[in-house]
Amino acid sequence: MKIKWIRHKNGYVYTSDITQAVSSVSWSGSVSQAARTAEIAVINAPNDKNVKNLKLNIGAGQVIKLYEGGDLIFFGEVQSARKTSETGTVTYTCYDLLNHLLKSTGVYNFSDTTAERITKKVCADLEIKTGSIAATKATIKKMIIDGDTFYDIIMKAYTKAAKQTGKKYICRMDGSKLSVEVKGKKVKNFVLAEEYNITNAEYEETIENMVNVVKIYDEKGAQVGEVKKDKWVEKYGIYQQIYKKEKGINEQAAAKSMLQGVEKRVTVEGINGDLKCIAGNGVEVYDKATGLNGLFWIDSDTHTWENGTHIMSLELNFKNIMDSKEYEENEE
């Protein structure tokens, strides 16, 4: 792991390798949080000559880069600093540039466009560079935005597109560039297994997000259809949502996509993890104690480096679930 600190002063850009002054690094993300986070614990030892020579005065808004094996895995801005004691550590919390999309809002009136064009438009307005943007070729007839975050604008567009393509999408930062990818890609050449790298595994079932009835309404408010999971209703009672018909969208397919059964969640901790095990990807897990066997999708991840050891903690899901942001017709 290599950590670099970048700051601007008097028109110049200064870069320092501060790896020797960092005692631990935590790099994390989740599907719902969107922006990835890095926490670096910097040694606060004013009497240590090596640390003193670095002249560490890391400030809010300055850039931190993390490299592993020569590859850039994080490019983000310092948001806050927490000092533990006079001669202990200072922990800096950093977010990648997706945080700008989460913290900024806009007003737009889109028509006859696509999710990919909407993404490039709002990123250009926010001066965020774009990388690989998933092509949907799915036409969005109309979408009026009034004060939504830029992240929600993008995800509303891709949620609409997903109803036509059947795919799920996720936003990620690739360095300083925003990418939109098809969600759920399997981590290649890596397996989590109790005999190799799993140190702990937990299994949980929950119905907190259950939807077993979806009623379909037209633009006049009249019910025109329904999708239902009778066995789920019989066992758990009714958990109902509504779907309002949209032009160009198959209402039965869209309503079915809203159904949500029992969620099965898994937490796995392991050593010698793979850096591709991040929120949104899929990973194979084999653990006899919990009965886990097969492909699971990562809802959240935390990678920690300390004392030369890489520890990985993952929250897994049995289903590949998108961070959907529904566009309500009454927003028009």
Feature locations, PLM:
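Acidic, small/polar-enriched beta strand-loop surface segments
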Residues: 1-6, 10-12, 155, 159, ...
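Charged- and aromatic-enriched interaction segments used to assemble
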Residues: 82-197, 201-203
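Oligomerization/assembly interface segments of phage tail-like spikes and tubes
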Residues: 32-49, 89-98, 216, 264-271, ...
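Assembly/oligomerization scaffold segments
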Residues: 1-100, 188, 193-201
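Well-ordered beta-strand positions in beta-sheet-rich domains
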Residues: 24, 72-77, 91, 105-107, ...
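Short amphipathic alpha-helical segments
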Residues: 54-56, 114, 118, 275-276
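Extended Gly/Ser/Thr-rich low-complexity repeat segments
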Residues: 50-62, 66, 104-110, 194-196, ...
